[in-house]
């Protein structure tokens, strides 16, 4: 277990009942996040709640019974505290989804201890989760997609120093951007690709989704051409030991990292769309948007993007869905005019 997990978990009243209770249905990283959230909450109580501050000197001293005596106001004050707090002189702010996650964690903790009858009152039942404001998805427009691939191909907007490297990487860069923009795969799935995962006969790649699930994703002939051009170069490169079979290689002949792909995308995006903050994930959003506009099938988009819940997809593409509904209003005629 990590030091953070241990210290925060022990802070939850020197027992790990809660973590033991949720272990069968949660990932270890989820439990670590829960532990951190609980630690932040207990620190808030100790530092900001006058009655607790005057009674206890450290978070591990706070008894479980304290949870029974909290009010909805205490939790609302915690939400305010989360938005902007001072931690040992370090200013920390939380975005809406981070605040919501911490409140969700508390709901789980209170619910668990109430269910096992360790507390007689569950104040969190009366606390509403903060509402998230949906942000407009940042993505490339259709002409910007073409411009980005063109820029990777010709490098016209690059500095002289960048152009020297570009000669060696342009075929790889075009292949990588074409794959991200033409399939919507995650950057982690992209860098995890091996030569053996690419099937040119069927225009498919075998990728490993979150949770270890293997899926075949299919690509267009346009993407195939870009991948084939890179593959012709790739087979002539001897990769470094420990990186055998990696499809996308760095200049050091090692498997590309997520960070290097992020930098690559940023480099070309700055040239073609300086006002948009484009990341590899935004290329995924671009693909999802274009696929949805072309097909109108939200279930297909969810499946191809690997969303386990179609509601996640609906939430992301709600604005386009609204446009489609608006366009439907004139589709059915009641009387010929």
Predicted ranges, named:
Residues 7-337:
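Conserved catalytic core of the tyrosine transesterase superfamily
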